[in-house]
């Protein structure tokens, strides 16, 4: 009976451990993002409230059709210098393929605005 209680206690402790999706001190912003370019910039990133467990973080992002990411900076709705969270293998999200010249032009404008914001923050 004692061994059962010890095993049950250890099992509860193992499953009840909190999960830090972004343990990297630099890339510590947990975001739900859409497409990106080589993890340099991710688009349409939003902060979502989630429990500190892995499946809820992934599920929260999946509800909006996005993927969990850990980013260095979030400016406007873009995540800069991002990576997949610990324990997560996202599908290839570095496939941003704008349809038409207007979308590409808008994308380049957004990137320019983000870089200006970063420069303003650094000054």
From Swiss-Prot:
CDD domains: hydrophobin_II. Gene3D superfamilies: Hydrophobin. Induction: Expression is not affected by carbon nor nitrogen starvation. Expression is neither affected by a deletion of Hyd1 or Hyd3. Expression is induced during Bionectria ochroleuca self interaction. One of its GO terms (cellular component) is extracellular region. The keyword Transmembrane helix does not apply. Pfam families: Hydrophobin_2. Keywords: Cell wall, Disulfide bond, Secreted, Signal. It comes from the Eukaryota. InterPro entries: Cerato-ulmin_hydrophobin, Hydrophobin_sf. Residues 1-16 form the signal peptide. Disulfide bonds join 22-70, 32-61, 33-45, 71-82. It is found in: Secreted; Secreted, Cell wall. Homodimer. Homodimers further self-assemble to form highly ordered films at water-air interfaces through intermolecular interactions. Belongs to the cerato-ulmin hydrophobin family. Aerial growth, conidiation, and dispersal of filamentous fungi in the environment rely upon a capability of their secreting small amphipathic proteins called hydrophobins (HPBs) with low sequence identity. Class I can self-assemble into an outermost layer of rodlet bundles on aerial cell surfaces, conferring cellular hydrophobicity that supports fungal growth, development and dispersal; whereas Class II form highly ordered films at water-air interfaces through intermolecular interactions but contribute nothing to the rodlet structure. This is Class II hydrophobin 2. It comes from Bionectria ochroleuca. The lineage of its organism: Eukaryota, Fungi, Dikarya, Ascomycota, Pezizomycotina.
